[in-house]
């Protein structure tokens, strides 16, 4: 990680042990947003909750923690070892002049112990704290409201069935800041005013905004807006948000409710009300009834980020306006005098249209973040849709079942859109897994049917 003229300081990042594949792209994206750069020299074990990062300044470390939902805390690393002896030797080699500002006689402090994959007794904790008496602490201990908090962190490995007596790694550092994990609870869809069948989990919603490097005063667009869950996380970070959807009832908050024990939506159940619930209404631009396959926007770059979750045909239908002779027409009332005719929308066409739209309407350096449904037995990296104007940044998997998953794809616009890119259909081979309406849907439910049949057979034995 580089920042011109700045010496790099080592920091310890403590991460939450969920959504493991999503953590590195989130931290990398946020560091670049803060003006840093993630280098291959970082001391990172992808599945470990402890990462050592080289960051130019404490302010950049704080900036990272003001955004991340994957990390719990960050510490200025004073010592690290594979044994207690190595840790103490490392601490003795840490420059005293860097320690002293936090060890003054008129300051207060406390020491906290955190262990991963093992629980220590209070006596064991006290013994470990007493072993640090060689450090020049001269302030007073204050357990309730200290000025400085120091942490001993111990890693006992990833196997809960084989916990070692001694830790594999030990760390000591000064606490700098906590991440934004509390947002997962405060924005939980359980408490949200307006939800749908496919409302995005709050944690994943914030991860998507971070992968998209959403920042204050950006304009963020969701072409499959649904109930607007993805707009909320972007608005929380200060972006102005808008979206479109083909379902008139959802956009206007009409029709049947998705919430249990509620038949119809209330008079104030809509996207705007969701943003109002969180004090974010000022960031709401609009939500329009529109077909994503037929863009309504004027030509030119309009959006800093496009963050979306296209329909897969499982809980929400894949539809677009128009009609097909071979398909059964469905009508949806939009105004008193106009009926929208919708037809099937192939998954291959959804992703082709989405990438083409992003290439044309994203600003240079803007990001597209979307979910790609995958039938795992057939998955290869080659089937991830590409576009000549978009660079693939990250590809993270979330399991849905033993045979299906979805992948969070993040792409960045690196080339200006030209007329010749209008129909840049990438090789047909990339889209073959999605050919035919709801091919993913059929494979998803074929797996469910097979599992049910197997369970019934096992029960008969």
UniProtKB/Swiss-Prot annotation:
Gene3D superfamilies: Vaccinia Virus protein VP39. It is an enzyme of class 2 (transferase). One of its GO terms (molecular function) is tRNA (guanine(10)-N2)-methyltransferase activity. One of its GO terms (biological process) is tRNA processing. Keywords: Cytoplasm, Methyltransferase, RNA-binding, S-adenosyl-L-methionine, Transferase, tRNA processing, tRNA-binding. GO terms for cellular component: cytoplasm; tRNA (m2G10) methyltransferase complex. It holds the Pfam family UPF0020. It is found in: Cytoplasm. It catalyses: guanosine(10) in tRNA + S-adenosyl-L-methionine = N(2)-methylguanosine(10) in tRNA + S-adenosyl-L-homocysteine + H(+). InterPro entries: DNA_methylase_N6_adenine_CS (IPR002052), RlmKL-like_Mtase (IPR000241), SAM-dependent_MTases_sf (IPR029063), tRNA_mtfrase_TRM11 (IPR016691). Its EC number is 2.1.1.214. The keyword Nuclease does not apply. Belongs to the class I-like SAM-binding methyltransferase superfamily. TRM11 methyltransferase family. Catalytic subunit of the TRMT11-TRM112 methyltransferase complex, that specifically mediates the S-adenosyl-L-methionine-dependent N(2)-methylation of guanosine nucleotide at position 10 (m2G10) in tRNAs. This is one of the major tRNA (guanine-N(2))-methyltransferases. This is tRNA (guanine(10)-N(2))-methyltransferase TRMT11.
């Amino acid at each position: 990680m580089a920042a011109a003229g700045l010496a790099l300081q080592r920091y310890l990042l403590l991460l939450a042990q969920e959504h493991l594949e999503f953590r590195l792209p989130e931290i990398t994206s946020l560091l670049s947003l803060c003006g840093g750069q993630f280098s291959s020299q970082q001391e990172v074990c992808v599945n470990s909750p402890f990462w050592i990062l080289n960051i130019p300044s404490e302010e950049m470390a704080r900036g990272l923690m003001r955004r991340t939902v994957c990390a719990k805390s960050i510490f200025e690393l004073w010592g690290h070892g594979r044994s207690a002896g190595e840790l103490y030797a490392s601490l003795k080699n840490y420059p005293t002049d860097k320690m002293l500002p936090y060890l003054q006689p008129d300051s207060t402090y406390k020491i906290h112990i955190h262990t991963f994959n093992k629980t220590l007794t209070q006596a064991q904790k006290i013994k470990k704290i007493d072993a640090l008496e060689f450090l020049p602490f001269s302030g007073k201990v204050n357990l309730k409201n200290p000025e400085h908090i120091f942490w001993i962190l111990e890693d006992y490995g990833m196997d809960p069935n084989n916990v070692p007596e001694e830790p594999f790694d030990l760390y000591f550092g000064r606490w700098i800041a906590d991440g934004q994990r509390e947002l997962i609870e405060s924005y939980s869809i359980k408490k949200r005013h307006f939800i749908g069948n496919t409302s995005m989990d709050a944690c994943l919603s914030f991860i998507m905004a971070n992968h998209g490097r959403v920042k204050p005063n950006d304009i963020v667009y969701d072409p499959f807006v649904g109930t607007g869950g993805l707009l909320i996380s972007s608005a929380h970070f200060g972006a102005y948000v808008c979206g479109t959807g083909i379902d008139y009832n959802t956009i206007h908050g009409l029709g049947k409710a998705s919430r249990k024990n509620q038949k119809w939506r209330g008079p104030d159940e809509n996207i705007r009300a969701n943003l109002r619930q969180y004090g974010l209404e000022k960031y709401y631009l609009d939500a329009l009834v529109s077909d994503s396959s037929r863009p309504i926007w004027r030509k030119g770059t309009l959006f800093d980020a496009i963050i979306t979750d296209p329909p897969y045909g499982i809980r929400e239908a894949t539809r677009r306006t128009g009609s097909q002779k071979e398909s059964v027409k469905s009508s949806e009332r939009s105004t008193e005098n106009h009926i929208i005719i919708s037809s099937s929308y192939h998954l291959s066409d959804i992703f082709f249209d989405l990438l083409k739209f992003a290439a044309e309407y994203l600003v240079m350096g803007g990001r597209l973040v979307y979910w790609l449904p995958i039938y795992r037995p057939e998955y290869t990296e080659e089937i991830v849709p590409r576009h000549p104007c978009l660079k693939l940044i990250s590809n993270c998997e979330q399991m849905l079942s033993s045979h299906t998953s979805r992948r969070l794809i993040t792409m960045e616009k690196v080339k200006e859109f030209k007329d010749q890119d209008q129909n840049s259909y990438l090789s047909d081979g990339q889209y073959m897994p999605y050919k035919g309406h709801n091919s993913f849907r059929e494979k998803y439910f074929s797996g469910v049917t097979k599992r049910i049949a197997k369970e019934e057979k096992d029960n008969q034995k």
